[in-house]
């Protein structure tokens, strides 16, 4: 089914429509068959079914929350499957559900993608949230990898079984590693001067950094700027700018039900 808006777009793209003021009407002139082929291509594009997305992860924000926020920003529906950790480690991990034996995974019409930052990069390209050009996309990937390092540092420290080593690891992460990376983010934002990490609009680089900082400092809550960021002026201003994006703020105020408490 092609609605009125789609016909308008089609007519503009093919330059075969006529638009009148006051009441917009669109007509497609009768043309020889060969000249209508571009129109047929656009019809297929406009009527193409949206893929079915299914995200599987533990009942945490963790490494999947930036993916959830990306869907929210794009306004795209997906199945948010919360996997019971005990069931995962005793049965599902080796079932073939995840080729890598890790979560999160994203199923796209049955095709399984693994690795959270690769999933984010894919969705960014699908939803027009990727920067322009290969160089800027590489910059976005670089920021995503920095966040991945932070997540790994926290996960390994938090999961340490020896109490003394755990305490030392968490102290290093919270007092040294995270402040150091916040300083790194501050430098990038100060240099860009456009209000976002890359270019002049929100990209998945902003989403992945924001989600980590919000999850770590605020436990996913929607309120204000974290105390830990206030000594970084550019980072603080950026955080508030991203936090108050309407779809992000709405998502923060309406988190996924069933989460358990975690370090990020």
Locate the predicted segments by residue.
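GST-like domain detector, emphasizing the conserved glutathione-binding G-site
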Residues: 46-172, 176-182, 191-193, 197, ...
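Short, Lys/Arg-enriched N-terminal segments with co-localized hydrophobic residues
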Residues: 25-49
């Amino acid at each position: 089914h092609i609605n009125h808006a789609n016909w308008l777009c089609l007519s503009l793209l093919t330059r075969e429509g006529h638009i009148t003021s006051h009441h917009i009407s669109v007509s497609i002139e009768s043309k020889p068959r060969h000249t209508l082929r571009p129109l047929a291509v656009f019809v297929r594009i406009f009527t193409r079914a949206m893929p079915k997305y299914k995200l599987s992860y533990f009942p945490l924000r963790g490494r999947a929350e930036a993916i959830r926020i990306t869907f929210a920003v794009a306004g795209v529906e997906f199945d948010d499957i919360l996997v019971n950790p005990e069931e995962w480690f005793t049965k599902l991990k080796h079932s073939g559900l995840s080729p890598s034996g890790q979560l999160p995974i994203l199923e796209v019409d049955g095709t399984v993608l693994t690795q959270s930052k690769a999933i984010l990069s894919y969705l960014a390209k699908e939803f027009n949230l990727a920067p322009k050009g290969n160089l800027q996309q590489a910059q976005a990937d670089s920021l995503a990898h920095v966040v991945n390092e932070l997540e790994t540092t926290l996960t390994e420290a938090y999961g340490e079984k020896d109490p003394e080593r755990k305490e030392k690891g968490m102290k290093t992460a919270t007092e040294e590693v995270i402040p150091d990376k916040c300083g790194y983010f501050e430098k990038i934002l100060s240099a860009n001067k456009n209000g976002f990490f890359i270019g002049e609009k929100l990209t998945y680089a902003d989403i992945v950094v924001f989600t980590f900082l919000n999850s770590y400092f605020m436990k996913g809550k929607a309120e204000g700027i974290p105390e830990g960021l206030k000594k970084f002026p550019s980072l603080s201003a950026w955080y508030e700018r991203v936090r108050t994006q309407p779809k992000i703020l709405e998502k923060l105020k309406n988190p996924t039900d069933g989460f358990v408490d975690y370090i990020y």
